[in-house]
Amino acid sequence: MLKNKGHSSKKDNLAVNAVALQDHILHDLQLRNLSVADHSKTQVQKKENKSLKRDTKAIIDTGLKKTTQCPKLEDSEKEYVLDPKPPPLTLAQKLGLIGPPPPPLSSDEWEKVKQRSLLQGDSVQPCPICKEEFELRPQVLLSCSHVFHKACLQAFEKFTNKKTCPLCRKNQYQTRVIHDGARLFRIKCVTRIQAYWRGCVVRKWYRNLRKTVPPTDAKLRKKFFEKKFTEISHRILCSYNTNIEELFAEIDQCLAINRSVLQQLEEKCGHEITEEEWEKIQVQALRRETHECSICLAPLSAAGGQRVGAGRRSREMALLSCSHVFHHACLLALEEFSVGDRPPFHACPLCRSCYQKKILEC
């Protein structure tokens, strides 16, 4: 009887151990406690399913202005642990068949893990999953001292359905949000901005120095003063008013004035003088008692009233509408050599007025 009892107790222990191991494997495969996954969704859904009547409150308008409390700004550089509370021990862990999970790390232990990560330079290097810089995106430190993007680790846990480190394959790691990558990225950006600003300041200072201080080399000095002279000439040219439209308007105005003057002159000198007017002009010329041509300074009529047949044309006189008398040949020569007069508008050699002429014979 004792042998049968001992044999049955061993079978019971084996059965309990087998059930405990199976239960532990099921719990391990279900991954109920992923560190980065949002474990509070179920609680939020439960709160949303509550009746809305509990949230409805009567609002009384008293006319008084309520003081709005500004929300407290949380420290963006604050580090915190993402892991929820550790799950209860499974039956296999309680029986000692499998070792219990490691306890949550303390602050000192997390500091050691962080120092080990800094020595490895994980925050300086890109994320091992997406191969991109950490920049200002959320960064997660694992208990194995490896660093990843929070979104990358969350996607890795979702698609692998396991809680193992992507690098060292450590199971059931703990996670903590850190900001070393963001801090290093800000330092890098500040360094770039400062370097760019210093470069701009130095280049501006050097350009001003080159504009004001001439070089010592002869060729460079010559180019320096040539450039200065070119700049001065350009400024002088730019200072002039080159309004072409105004110049064209002034030219058109001058042409209009000239046309009006010529039109008045044509109206004055263009009409034909009648015989009666010529007689009056001839009487006025006789009153002048002019005896010599003002062009050749020779007498207007031959001495003693003699006439030479060959030189008859040379003795012809021209009476002008201004009552001046000249030799016809002298007047023709003057008209041929006059510059600037436009026929038939010639100017009298004495009074400079436009004239019409009539040929008189001595």
UniProtKB/Swiss-Prot annotation:
Zinc finger regions, RING-type: 127-169, 293-352
Organism of derivation: Homo sapiens
Keyword field contains Zinc-finger: yes
PROSITE patterns: IQ, ZF_RING_2
InterPro entries: IQ_motif_EF-hand-BS, RNF32, Znf-RING_euk, Znf_RING, Znf_RING/FYVE/PHD
Protein name: RING finger protein 32
One cellular-component annotation, GO: nuclear body
Gene coding for it: RNF32
Primary location: cytoplasm
Reported tissue expression: Highly expressed in testis, less abundant in ovary.
UniProt-listed Gene3D superfamilies: 1.20.5.190, Zinc/RING finger domain, C3HC4 (zinc finger)
